[in-house]
Every structure is written in C-alpha cells, then in structure tokens.
Amino acid sequence: MFGQQLASDVQQYLERLEKQRQLKVGADEASAGLTMGGDALRVPFLDFATATPKRHQTVVPGVGTLHDCCEHSPLFSAVARRLLFNSLVPAQLKGRDFGGDHTAKLEFLAPELVRAVARLRFKECAPADVVPQRNAYYSVLNTFQALHRSEAFRQLVHFVRDFAQLLKTSFRASSLTETTGPPKKRAKVDVATHGRTYGTLELFQKMILMHATYFLAAVLLGDHAEQVNTFLRLVFEIPLFSDAAVRHFRQRATVFLVPRRHGKTWFLVPLIALSLASFRGIKIGYTAHIRKATEPVFEEIDACLRGWFGSARVDHVKGETISFSFPDGSRSTIVFASSHNTNGIRGQDFNLLFVDEANFIRPDAVQTIMGFLNQANCKIIFVSSTNTGKASTSFLYNLRGAADELLNVVTYICDDHMPRVVTHTNATACSCYILNKPVFITMDGAVRRTADLFLADSFMQEIIGGQARETGDDRPVLTKSAGERFLLYRPSTTTNSGLMAPDLYVYVDPAFTANTRASGTGVAVVGRYRDDYIIFALEHFFLRALTGSAPADIARCVVHSLTQVLALHPGAFRGVRVAVEGNSSQDSAVAIATHVHTEMHRLLASEGADAGSGPELLFYHCEPPGSAVLYPFFLLNKQKTPAFEHFIKKFNSGGVMASQEIVSATVRLQTDPVEYLLEQLNNLTETVSPNTDVRTYSGKRNGASDDLMVAVIMAIYLAAQAGPPHTFAPITRVS
C-alpha cells in the first residue's frame, strides 16, 4: 500500500515539473526542437493564435491551435501528425515512398510552396493573450507524451523495430540486433527491386500484419489507442487511409483466402514469434486442420525464440504450449491445437487466434472457434487456401458480400473474368490486375495443363483457387445491360430514313428436317443505320409438312414481310440482297429463291411499277463443291464462328437495334417480336474445347429453337461483308 502511494506521488511530482518546464520555455526553442530528429513532441507552444471561435479550433502538436478545417486536409493532417512519431520510426522503414526522413526535409512539397511559406511573417502575441490556446496545446501534448512514456507503447515500438530488422533479412536473422553484414535471403524470396537490399512483403502478408498490430495496439494501449493510429499510419505508410479503413483493422474477425504456396504459414511463424517476444502478457492461439500441420509451426516458433533470446527464456510443452519469459517475471504464451482436438483451446483467454487452413477444419471445431467472438479482446484471423472443389472445403466463400467486409481474397482473376479464364486453358490470370507474383511461384499455361492432365479442374480448384466449371455448363456471352438496351431502345426508321443505308439484307433459314416442331424457319430483314445494324422484320414459323408446297409457302412469307418493309419506307432502299441457306436442302433453297424472285416481280408489276423503278433484287450465289455453276443459295460452313463473334461484339457494344416499326406476320400475333428474339439470344452460349481452344456457339439450350437468332446473326454478318462482285446477283441477268 505504501509503495503504491509513493508511486502515485512521484508521478504527480513529475507532471508538475513537466508543466513548470513547459511554462518556462519560449518560442525561440521551437526551431531547436524541430531539428532534434523531427519529433514534434519536443516543440514548445508557439505564441500565436487563430481568430476563430473555440468550437472551430483544433490543436496540432508541434504546430499549435488552428482552424479545424485543417483536420479535413489529408495532406496537412498526415504531415503534421507524422512529425509526432518521426524519430520513433525504425531506420529500415525510413526513406521509403512518402515517409521517414523525407518528411523533415519537406522533399514532398513543391519548391515554390516552400519558398512562399518561408516568406510569411507572423505577428507574435503577448503570452497573456494566448493562455487558453497554450493550455489547450499542452493538454493535447501531454496526452501524446503520456503515450510515449507508457510501457505498452514502448513494446509496440520495439515490435515495429524488430519486425523491420526481420524484414531486412527476409525473416532469417539470427539476431534482432543491427548487423553490418549482407542480409540473409532465403533462396526462394523475390529479388531486391529498385536498389533495395531488404526483403519485401506480399500485400496480403502486410494486411495480416496490420490486422494483428492494430488489434494488439487497441487492446494493450486502451485509452491511447486513438493516438497510436498516427504512429501506425506512419509505420505502414498509409497516411491517407480513412478512419473507417483503420477501424476495419480492429474488427474481431477477418478471413484471408490465398492461393497455394504463397507464404501463408511461412509468414505467420515470425509474426507470432515476435509478438510473443514483444508484447508482455499476451496469449495467442494457433489451430490447424490436423496435428501434423501444427507441429512444424510449433518447432519453427520455438527455434526462432531460442535463436533470438536463448533457451533460458523459452519454456514449452511439446506440441502444445510455448511460454516466453520477460525480465519482470511476466510471460506471453501460445497454445497449439488441431481441429481434431479443439478442447485444448476451450477455456483459454486469447488475444489473437490464428486458424490455419480454415477451409479444411472440422465443423465442430468451427463451433468452438466461433465462441471466441464473444471475447472483446480476442481477434480471430482465418488463413486458408482457396479450394473450391466442394462446399465443405469452400465455406469461407459464403462471407462474400458481407457488410463488415470480413473476407480478403488473394486472386489473380477477378470475378467478372473468372468464367472466361476457366474456359481458356492457357490463361492463369486476367488483365485487370498487375500483381507482384512471387518468383518462387511457377504459374503459367504449362502448369495449368499439366495439373488438369492429372485431374480435371485441379488447377482452378487447388492452385489458383478459382471457381471450377461445372460439367456441361456453357457460358452465356451477351451481357444483361446490352439485352435491356436492345429491348427498350428502338429508333423510328420511318422518320429517319436519311440515316439508313440503301441496301436491305434478307436471310432465310428454312427448316427441312424430320422434327418439324423443334426446327422452324427463321427470316430476318436487316439494314445499316449509321454505323450500326437495325432489324426491320422478323419471321419465325413451323410448317406442318416439309414437302410439296413448303418452298412456295416459305417464299410467300418472305415476300410479304419484305414488301411491308418497302411500303413503310418508300424510296428508301435501292437494293434487296437475299440469302437462302441451303445446308438442309439445296434443291429446296433454289426453289425458295426462285419463288421469291417470281413473287416479288409479280407484286411490283401488279402495283404498276416499272422494272427499273423498284429496288434491285439480288440473290446470294455460291458454287457447291464439285460444281462449276453458281446456284442461288448460301452454304453455312466456316462462316458461323466469325459471324457469331462479330454479332456478339456489336450487340454488347449497342451496335444492334430493332426498328420501332418492326414487321412480323408470324410472331406479332403471339408476342413482341423483339422480346421473342431476345429470348433466343439469351440462350446463346459459348463452349471452348479444353484441348484445342476452339470456340463453338449454340442457341439450342433447354430444347429451345434458334432459327430466328441464326437468321438475324447471318443477315448482319452478310451486311458487314464486302464479298466478290458475283456473290449477290439477279437470278435472271439483265442484258
């Protein structure tokens, strides 16, 4: 009791002496304080004040009382507060990017700004006039000085200093003291870049370090947790991080999903060992999916502590606990357990609980671990590879989209491009990210093909951690936004005929198969609208029989649809180019073309039009294999893939539209022709052969027909091609 009272009296006496010293110092000592390592806590109060109400004032140690708008200037706020801890940043972390000694030299400021500020002269206030400002200044200053004097903050500073030393030697230092020899590099670590001779951290490793450090600082420093944020922003080089982002690192659970062989467990070993050796009285838990996975970690941590501090301060129970002793008698402890025996961590009081390979731990072990969420001073850090082979080894993916943003996924493929990378066997990353892939990682197309030779989709499941393609699951290729635009935006072609090209393209996909209900006849009439393509007519129908008068019936429907388009746009078109597909029946295709030619000329003649006044009617002609005669039909062979690719590109970019005055004698009776076409387009899928990378397109999904879709795609393809002169020609040439 007497000792406690004596300690309290001594502390009060020290505070009185400190206050007296602050009252005696003058503004002339300010410059001397700034030159002593750039530590703003040594700068006395400067006799100046801001002419603003007290509620709008803020105090910045080393600067003074300012308008609180300065708090909302990220550059000023970061620079001013970084001066508070500049002398405490380890030399290994200085001179990197924006921080360290560069701050004291103002190297990040424009020379013109430095010269302008140097010319400013401030009016010195009388000491009696700035008593409130002086009191407020020293009140804030005393808070930061109390932080500096606290034992917990010293432990944090030592942790940062020692971690910087470990980073310098790539975590292979035999001692935590400074060494003058060359840094020891592990054989697999990435080579030094930009002239650096120290090791570097992967981004996810730095994130794990920040999560652990921020939480331990909040637990150990208590009331000073807010002030220490400035120091940690300086250490981690995140001066512009918002307060919300900083609070993210204090949350009591976080999950990291990292591809295989990226240094997850390798990084946890020095982090845990140094935490035990730096923070007095903390307790750490470590659990993995099997005991064989915890034993190497136990041995590595034990070896690190003994190598740094000797065996006298390290005590352990084989495979279960490691205790580290401090000179004052306090101890820090780590407890190990596997998911098969999580009773070892029940009843413990952890500050950090690391769950390694969390995707593979037993469900009952997850329940035990979740119990620690009820402990206010415990943080659970889940670290696992991103296996997606089955739900039981991918349950952490369920955290995606959570409001508290628990999940951190390290990936080389974004969600949008994952389906495309899955279908392309040589791809191992998408173009969205430029990641620093470790040099000890071999991840290319050859590795992917080799892995998939042993077991299908093993690369995407086990190595990269992406979503594996389900069997028979083809990928849709048209975007939802493009489909909505196609459905809603329909320009009027009757009032904008001057924007259209003078040629119409008609594609007929006749049905001549035994299954008359599954395969119908599709007809599309398209043209050019500025640089885009526009659909004027759509027809889709099924015939009762495909013999006898079927060619004449198909031709009659084509003619009726075409003449309606011409009637709605009088004088707008000078040519009509018709292509009749002949893959099913070349004889029927020739018959359809002949009937269209005859019927069109009969209708034009009945209207009293001259042969030269109407649009020129041309038919696609091709030369079948083994023949020297051109026939009026179109053979669809190798043109299908480029035609579909051209259509997909134009459709997704908004280059395919439907006319507001669209014509349809067969579809409009049932539904909107554009909606009807869009239903077929939504069935369009792309399949890539896993061995040859050959793409095939199909619209026959779930038994749906694709005749109208094929007719539209091929009509647009023909409208975009500049074929040879004889490609389109009249059936009866005009002499």
Swiss-Prot record:
It is an enzyme of class 3 (hydrolase). The active site is at E357, D509, E581, D707. One of its GO terms (biological process) is chromosome organization. It holds the Pfam family DNA_pack_N. It is found in: Host nucleus. The keyword Disulfide bond does not apply. The keyword Ribosomal protein does not apply. A motif (Nuclear localization signal) lies at residues 183-189. GO terms for molecular function: DNA binding; hydrolase activity. A motif (Walker A motif) lies at residues 258-265. A motif (Walker B motif) lies at residues 352-357. Its main location: host cell. Its EC number is 3.1.-.-. Belongs to the herpesviridae TRM3 protein family. Interacts with the terminase subunits TRM1 and TRM2. Interacts with portal protein. This is Tripartite terminase subunit 3. It comes from Human herpesvirus 1 (strain 17). The lineage of its organism: Viruses, Duplodnaviria, Heunggongvirae, Peploviricota, Herviviricetes.
